[in-house]
Design a protein with these regions (language model features):
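An N-cap/entry alpha-helix motif that binds or orients negatively charged groups
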Residues: 2-69
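Conserved, mostly hydrophobic/aromatic
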Residues: 7, 54, 79, 129, ...
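C-terminal helical cap(s) of enzyme catalytic domains, especially alpha/beta-barrels
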Residues: 203-207, 230, 245-260
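Active-site beta-loop-alpha junctions enriched in small/polar residues
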Residues: 10, 57-59, 92, 119, ...
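Catalytic cores of alpha/beta
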Residues: 121-132, 169-179, 216, 220-239
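N-terminal active-site wall of soluble small-molecule enzyme domains
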Residues: 56, 63-164, 170-175, 201-204
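Glycine-rich phosphate-binding active-site loops on the catalytic face of alpha/beta enzymes
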Residues: 128-148, 185-194, 232-252
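Catalytic-face loop-and-helix region of soluble metabolic enzyme cores
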Residues: 183-239
Length: 260
């Protein structure tokens, strides 16, 4: 069983427990009381030039604790001031030590759109993301079927949420396109052995048509990495560990954005 399988299994357990507290129908009623989203995450990434999705992440399965001190609200506000276009918030509690409350409080505190970074395995989690204040959800091809991705994108469309469809290889890129993804992320991290190869983004970029937004995820640590992604025509880059390990996150983001 891969780490992704374990993460997906835990997400199913969490969702099952959440449904005991609030049913899907009750959650849908909560969502109906909110204004419809207007795809602000996609709009932020569509702007000219490379967009930066900056991540609030305390830990990861590959690196363990990344940030002993985790003033998540201040981190998110610093990202916004430093020019982040979007903010990614981990809500997976076991391996990433994330929390739904982190997302809710960050979404309330900043004006840039937020991505709920979690392992979406049930439509419940999409409605939950909207109620928590997210503007986008992550759909990972490795743990979903093409039909599920298609169904979840349709639900996102109804709610005005953006769906970032994450891929790891050529087969998954084609699967995402077949499912109607408008925004595809290529994860440069191999989730079987945690190795990182930013060449993934370069190799798979050519498979993604120009009318589909292209996001490079993981492994970006230098201005040179950013420059190379600009050259291949990436629309956005998602940066987590590099920023989280920086003592001055705003300065690090400014350094990475400086090549633009």
């Amino acid at each position: 069983m891969t780490i992704l399988d374990q993460l997906a299994g835990c997400a199913r357990e969490r969702t099952g427990q959440a449904k005991l507290r609030i049913s899907l129908e009750e959650l849908k009623q909560q969502e109906l009381s909110l204004p419809k989203g207007n795809f602000t995450f996609e709009k932020a990434i569509k702007k000219p030039g490379l967009s930066f999705i900056c991540e609030c992440k305390k830990a990861s399965p590959s690196k363990g604790i990344i940030a002993q001190e985790f003033p998540y609200l201040q981190i998110a506000k610093d990202y916004e001031v430093a020019g982040a276009d979007c903010i990614s918030v981990l809500t997976e509690p076991k391996w990433f030590l994330g929390s739904d409350q982190y997302l809710k409080k960050i979404a309330d505190a900043v004006s840039v759109p937020c991505l709920r970074k979690d392992f979406t395995v049930d439509e419940y989690m999409i409605y939950e993301a909207k109620v928590l204040g997210a503007s986008a959800v992550l759909l990972i091809c490795s743990i979903l079927s093409e039909e599920q991705i298609k169904e979840y994108i349709s639900i996102c469309d109804e709610l005005g949420l953006s769906a970032l469809v994450e891929t790891h290889d050529e087969c998954e890129v084609r699967m995402a396109l077949n499912a109607g993804a408008r925004m595809i992320g290529v994860n440069n991290r191999n989730l079987k052995d945690f190795s990182v190869d930013t060449g993934n983004s370069r190799r798979f970029r050519k498979l993604i048509p120009p009318d589909v937004l292209f996001v490079s995820e993981s492994g970006v640590s230098s201005a040179e990495d950013v420059r190379k992604l600009c050259e291949i025509g990436a629309d956005a880059v998602l940066i987590g560990e590099t920023l989280m390990r920086a003592e001055n996150k705003a300065a690090k983001l400014a350094e990475l954005r400086g090549v633009l």
